[in-house]
Design a protein with these regions (language model features):
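N-terminal targeting segments with Sec-dependent signals, encompassing both cleavable signal peptides
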Residues: 1-212
């Protein structure tokens, strides 16, 4: 009855405690059982701001978990700083995502050999992002067949756009345009030029989203 009379949990608990002073059985046998259930959902979660994350990377990186480390890396511009964070995530958590992202950073630094070596450490070889990065390395090495197979297996938007690049290199311009459509990239503009859609190419070049 007490549980129904009071909607405020604090008031309800106070009244139950008052009852327990009168009813010894209630206090000894029933209340302890219900009390234990209260702590199961008592979870604390620290959600750092971007500024706090960057500060912690510099001052106390050891307290950051895998998710915080990966997020922190996206906030930094310098490749060396990103590599430091990804190395920490790899060392502490054996993070596949950190391994793949480290390989991407190395590719952006045009260090293909090290990127290849790092990417090979990925445990889940079926991961779409692993396959996409594998395709990029193959493309950089001029192996179009291997790149095409990896991008097809990845089956994500980035890989689809990369397949468009493969199609351009193979001279399959309409197929490239189909793959690149909607990316608003320089590659989409190029595919439009190669298929004689000059007005479309001009419009894309006005506000292309990436330097690719």
């Amino acid at each position: 009855r007490v549980l129904q009379m009071y909607s405020d949990p604090a008031v309800r608990e106070k009244e139950i405690k008052n009852m327990s002073q009168v009813y010894t059985t209630l206090k000894k046998d029933i209340l302890p059982e219900h009390r234990r259930a209260r702590f199961i959902a008592n979870i604390e979660f620290t959600n750092y701001t971007n500024e706090e994350l960057v500060a912690l990377v510099n001052d106390n990186i050891e307290i950051l978990d895998e998710e915080a480390l990966l997020r922190a890396a996206t906030l930094l511009k310098e490749n060396d700083a990103k590599l430091t964070i990804y190395n920490k995530a790899i060392d502490k958590f054996n993070s596949d995502r950190a391994i793949i992202n480290k390989a991407v950073v190395l590719l952006n630094m045009n260090n293909i050999a090290d990127a290849t070596s790092v990417l090979a450490q990925t445990a889940d070889k079926n991961c779409p992002f692993y396959q996409n990065s594998l395709g990029v390395i193959a493309l950089r090495n001029g192996d179009l067949a291997k790149a095409e197979a990896a991008f097809a297996k990845a089956n994500i938007d980035a890989a689809k756009a990369n397949l468009g690049v493969v199609n351009i290199l193979k001279g399959e311009y309409q197929a490239a345009l189909n793959m690149l459509k909607g990316t608003q990239s320089f590659n989409e503009a190029l595919a439009n030029i190669l298929t004689n859609n000059l007005d479309a190419a001009s419009n894309i070049l006005k506000d292309a989203k990436c330097p690719c």
